[in-house]
Amino acid sequence: DRTVTGVQTCALPISFECAESQPLTHLRITLHPDGGIARLRAYGEFWEEERDSNFDGINVLSKESGARAIYANDEHFGCLSNILEKHEPLSMADGWETRRRREPGNDWGVLALSKPAQVEKIIVDTKFFKGNFPHTFSLSTAYIVNEEDSSIIESSQSWTKLLERQKLGMNQIHTFDKKDIIHNETFTHVRIDIYPDGGIARLKFIGKFV
């Protein structure tokens, strides 16, 4: 065991930096002498043992692997981060769904991996989306380090295409392999474009961290 922060005087709310930044798996909070707290949040980065970095065939674009949603232009019916979940979709609300577009254009979102990766298979699941799945979608990637999310969002329109526009069907799993994937370059961020709108339940990138 090690102490990551000493005794803190409570305020409403209170925030502080940890005394060290070593990887950890568990947190214990001690109240002096008693009382209650409403929320505890620990901010940081997902850390993965080196032995797992070269393991092939994992979903590098999942919350379990440390991926996160940065931005979506529309999350009217469901959050973009839902498509990173490991568990099977529970309902339409468990996916990412945008409102019907009345104006030109398409909906899109930006995702970040926990570390650089390469992909060999892409899976898109439209489970539960029957009359409201996107007609087509495409994927783009970029290798970015030490940039603010705001600048990443702005630059995403010019990223390298990973998958050209592909048709989607209702309530089914779609798989795209090496013959569909345009490049095998290492990347850290993904942009998904759906045309024109709609919902998907899950997006998986099967590959390896490098």
Where are the language model's segments positioned?
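Noncatalytic modules at the cell exterior or secretory-pathway interfaces
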Residues: 19-33, 182-196
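Extended extracellular/luminal ectodomain segments enriched in beta-structured repeat modules
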Residues: 22-24, 104-106, 114-121, 185-187
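Single conserved hydrophobic/aromatic residue that forms the stacking wall/gate
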Residues: 1-10
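A short beta-strand element within beta-rich, extracytoplasmic domains
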Residues: 27-29, 117-128, 192
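Short, surface-exposed beta-strand/strand-loop-strand elements in extracellular ectodomains
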Residues: 132-145
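Edge beta-strands of jelly-roll/beta-sandwich modules across compartments, strongly enriched
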Residues: 35-46, 198-210
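Disordered, acidic Ser/Thr/Pro-rich linker "stalks" and the adjacent N-terminal cap
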Residues: 43-114, 130-132, 155-156, 165-168, ...
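Extended, low-complexity, turn-rich repeat/linker tracts enriched in Gly/Pro/Ser/Thr and Asp/Glu
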Residues: 35, 127-135
